[in-house]
């Protein structure tokens, strides 16, 4: 990872806290997805917003008044997810009796485990591929120096707000498409995706303007002490990444829609393209353009993934529509024959 020796211990402290708190992340995702599976997509979104705002508040609290440094940032992440996990669990148990487990529910079922693993392994591998790309970027940033690392980290914290918003769009359209795909309502899928894209564009435009307008005030919040070089590194990252937020919205919505129509291969291939795009930019663009070349690796990765996701989405919609039309024509023909 090319981590500078002077910040190795800080990195170790952050990683130790985050890995120790993996259970909080697991249970938060578990209960929020249980609620979505039971048809309640609004409540997990509310808890996601609460978790994000709480994370930002705790970041400021632990870093500024308490002087806990990077370990404080890690604790802020873990505690915000833990609190949200508890809220999700309490809400689920209170409002959905099916989540109140009995003794017999704890019996092991090999068939159920196999079904879960069949879905979990591809998704887990997909997320791992995305993380490898981010590690390549971080490794390239680490070569530049500690100020670049601090600036990149501060900007990433701010950028995370937009990522969470777009993930929410992806989760929303995923549930919507899955329900309508199961019911064979292709027209509703097209309308829903179109509406989500429009809302996503508006949301990303607003988020982008807000971030760029307030960056001079927000960036210092995530800095331990005033430093002009760190500030400029963070600012450069935001000016590169923010104008491409519209692509992030497209990526989240199209990928989730395709997955919800039963295609797990295409999103996986899109992740592979993202991975190689990030690695290529991190290794080669950084040689010619330095830090800004690394920053551009994320937008290039989004563009690469969209090159496969967008055509596949519209081809899938067209294919399903034609199949439905053929079945409808066949049914009409059978009715006419019966009448004769």
For each feature predicted by the language model, list its residue ranges.
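Transmembrane helical elements of multi-pass membrane transporters/channels
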Residues: 17, 28, 51, 80-84, ...
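Small-residue-rich hydrophobic transmembrane alpha-helices
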Residues: 25-44, 151-215, 248-262, 266-270
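Short membrane-interface helical motifs at transmembrane helix boundaries
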Residues: 1-16, 208-228
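Membrane-interface helix-loop junctions in multi-pass transport and translocation proteins
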Residues: 52-86, 217, 275-307, 311
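Helix-loop interface residues and adjacent transmembrane-helix termini in multi-pass membrane transporters
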Residues: 37-38, 65-67, 71, 143-146, ...
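Alpha-helical transmembrane segments of multi-pass membrane proteins
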Residues: 5-28, 228-251
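Interhelical loop/hinge segments that connect adjacent transmembrane helices in multipass membrane
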Residues: 77, 86-130, 319-340
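Interfacial/gating helices of multi-pass transporter permease domains
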Residues: 6-10, 70-71, 112-119, 141-160, ...
């Amino acid at each position: 990872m090319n981590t500078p020796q002077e910040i190795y211990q800080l990195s170790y402290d952050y990683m130790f806290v985050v890995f120790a708190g993996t259970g909080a992340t697991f249970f938060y995702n578990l209960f929020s997805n249980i609620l979505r599976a039971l048809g309640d997509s609004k409540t997990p979104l509310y808890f996601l917003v609460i978790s994000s705002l709480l994370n930002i508040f705790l970041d400021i609290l632990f870093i500024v008044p308490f002087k806990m440094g990077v370990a404080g940032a890690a604790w802020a992440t873990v505690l915000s997810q833990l609190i949200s996990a508890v809220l999700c669990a309490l809400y689920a148990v209170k409002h959905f009796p099916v989540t109140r487990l009995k003794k017999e529910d704890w019996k092991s079922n090999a068939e159920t485990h196999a079904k879960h693993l069949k879905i979990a392994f591809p998704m887990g591998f997909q997320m791992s591929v995305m993380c490898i790309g981010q590690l390549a970027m971080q490794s390239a940033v680490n070569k530049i120096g500690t100020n670049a690392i601090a600036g990149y980290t501060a900007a990433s914290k701010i950028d995370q707000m937009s990522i969470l918003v777009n993930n929410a769009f992806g989760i929303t359209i995923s549930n919507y498409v899955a329900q309508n795909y199961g019911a064979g309502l292709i027209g509703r899928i097209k309308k829903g995706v179109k509406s989500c894209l429009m809302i996503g564009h508006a949301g990303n435009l607003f988020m982008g303007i807000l971030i760029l307008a307030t960056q001079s005030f927000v960036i210092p919040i995530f800095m331990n002490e005033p430093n002009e070089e760190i500030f400029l590194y963070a600012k450069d990252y935001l000016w590169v990444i923010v104008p491409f937020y519209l692509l992030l919205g497209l990526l989240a919505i199209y990928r989730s829609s395709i997955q919800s129509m039963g295609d797990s291969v295409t999103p996986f291939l899109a992740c592979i393209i993202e991975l190689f795009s990030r690695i290529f930019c991190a290794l080669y663009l950084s040689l010619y353009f330095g830090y800004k070349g690394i920053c551009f690796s994320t937008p290039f990765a989004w563009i690469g993934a969209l090159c496969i996701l967008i055509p596949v989405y519209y081809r899938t919609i067209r294919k399903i529509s034609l199949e439905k039309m053929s079945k409808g024509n066949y049914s009409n023909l059978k009715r006419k024959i019966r009448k004769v």
